[in-house]
Amino acid sequence: MALSTNNNSSHVGADDFLELENILSSEYNEEGIFKTSKTVCIRTDKRIGVGFLTPNDMISRLVGFINRKAEDAGVRSVESFRQISDVVLIIVPQIALPAELSLKLVDSANILEAVNDQEVTVNSTGGPCVVVMNCAHSIPNEDRTHVNGSEVHRRLGIQYQVDCDNISGRVTTFSITALWREAFSFRPSFYKVSDPLVVPISVGFRKAVIAKSHADLQRSIGRGLIVTHHSSESSVTSESPIDLTVKKSTGLKIRDKSEDDNQRKHPVPLTSSNNKLKTLRVSTTPIVNGRSTSTSE
């Protein structure tokens, strides 16, 4: 936003009305800026990129615009600041290849350096994780910087860099959900902060649904095998052929046909240990008046 100023006064120009029109528009959009819709899913589909955090709703953007213009015009006698803290990034890998993601919390005044060493590196092989960053200073609302040739108010953002081999083009390597806190204050703030915190997210194993149904599994195997023009003769190789048998108690089991032949040739005798039938014993002692009496003479 271009702004003509001198020591005594400042005026509102055409660029100011253009910025206000964009803020009031429901289709508010700035190239390289993370809007509310983008905070749902930030896709790292480039090798390197940066996106700046904006207020979450149009009212906050409008209030910030009014505060900045009031300061520029000399209406306010005090400065105002935006305090951004507790930047939470939920990172989920989107490829099944090793990829390294480097993140920095940056200021639009200098997007090359991390703010207070707030930088971290995660790997896709580690699975999803949560990265928590913080900011140790507030940003004056009057400050302006240039983004893509346009003058906008100074803001914080997330810079990412992806290092991954064997991929080309615009491939999404990670998806990032960004959340943060933003507060308005008339006083500047400065806090000491700790290093970024990385919290891994434990996930369960995905089991094939078709493996739970033996009938569906058999049908899938049948559809996946070409059995036409095949003879039913036994295999002539030294390896014994295998077949798929379904057992209600044990489920799907791969059995060797030689085991069945061996059981037919050498049947296992039925012993008391493997006999499942139980003998019902009947007592012959009569019961008289609730007491048992012996029948022996």
From Swiss-Prot:
Q: Where is the composition biased (Polar residues)?
A: 270-297
Under InterPro entries, the record lists:
MPV
A cellular component annotation (GO) from this entry: host cell plasmodesma
Segments of skewed composition (Basic and acidic residues): 253-264
Q: Where in the cell is it found?
A: Host cell junction, Host plasmodesma
The annotated region (Disordered) lies at 249-297
Main subcellular location: host cell
| GO biological process assignments | transport of virus in host, cell to cell
| Keywords for the protein's UniProt record, in alphabetical order | Host cell junction, Transport, Viral movement protein
Which purpose does this protein serve, as stated in its record? Transports viral genome to neighboring plant cells directly through plasmosdesmata, without any budding. The movement protein allows efficient cell to cell propagation, by bypassing the host cell wall barrier.
Q: How is this protein named in the record?
A: Putative movement protein
Organism name: Citrus leprosis virus C (isolate Citrus sinesis/Brazil/Cordeiropolis/2003) (CiLV-C)
The encoding gene: MP
